[in-house]
Curated annotation (Swiss-Prot):
Organism: Methanosarcina mazei (strain ATCC BAA-159 / DSM 3647 / Goe1 / Go1 / JCM 11833 / OCM 88)
Database matches in PANTHER family: OROTATE PHOSPHORIBOSYLTRANSFERASE (PTHR19278), PYRE-LIKE PROTEIN (PTHR19278:SF41)
Source domain of life: Archaea
Pfam family name, one: Pribosyltran
Domain comment (free text): Contains an N-terminal DNA-binding winged helix-turn-helix domain and a C-terminal regulatory domain (or effector binding domain) resembling phosphoribosyltransferase (PRT) domain.
Listed name of the protein: Transcriptional regulator GfcR
Transcription regulation among keywords: yes
Gene Ontology biological process terms from the UniProt entry: pyrimidine nucleobase biosynthetic process; regulation of gene expression; UMP biosynthetic process
Similarity field: Belongs to the purine/pyrimidine phosphoribosyltransferase family. GfcR subfamily.
Length: 204
């Protein structure tokens, strides 16, 4: 996407296809606040100032299995480097739905680990207090295991925090988080190290 008008058009298109705010945010790799602003602006309502956010379009990687493979190898290398410091092995690679799944499954294969899938509550617009995401029962178990969390982009860190908390409640041990792009710029979230191929730091 080249400009703000493209983002607005894509947000409206996704909304018209039935996606909720959280799902649109996931597709465009922006915050929910940015999606709300884009949709409000599309209706030509009185515009509030634009939120400070950065849209990340990594579709040139996502559309190619070969590119995904090579990126997953780079992410594996970062995981190994991080876990060697504590002499820890990876038991399970947890992919955050939807965009973390292809990378996580390739990484699990490369690392010789099980693969688990996490459905975030972010995809739901009407989140009830206390409502949590879920680990799919169709994939690997995380209980008592060393886990690496894989997602595409960290924006605010709320989804990452949600996954970490859920894993700990299931007696799993989150050991690292790896992403393509970190827009938050944190070294850790809930004492779990964050590794990213690209870290974006906004200078205002």
């Amino acid at each position: 996407m080249k400009n703000i008008e493209d983002l607005i058009q894509k947000a409206v298109e996704l909304q018209n296809n039935g996606l909720g705010t959280g799902q649109i945010a996931d597709e465009l790799n922006v915050s929910r606040e940015t999606v709300t602003w884009l949709l409000t602006r599309s209706k030509k309502e009185v515009a509030a100032p634009a939120p400070k956010d950065i849209s990340v379009n990594w579709s040139s990687i996502g559309k190619s299995a070969t590119r995904l493979h090579y990126i997953s190898l780079a992410l594996c290398d970062m995981v190994i480097e991080t876990l060697e410091k504590t002499n820890t092995e990876v038991d399970v690679v947890v992919g955050v739905a939807a965009s973390g799944i292809p990378l996580a499954s390739m990484m699990a294969n490369e690392l010789g680990a099980d693969f688990a899938l996490y459905h975030s509550r972010k995809g739901q617009d009407m989140v009830q207090p206390g409502q949590k995401g879920t680990i799919s029962r169709n994939f690997g178990s995380v209980a008592g295991k060393n886990c690496v969390i894989v997602d595409d982009v960290i924006t605010t860190g709320s989804t990452t925090m949600e996954v970490i908390e859920q894993l700990r409640e299931m007696d799993a041990k989150p050991r690292a988080v790896v992403v393509l792009v970190d827009k938050k710029g944190a070294d850790t979230i809930a004492n779990v190290p964050i590794q990213s191929l690209v870290r974006i730091v906004r200078v205002d």
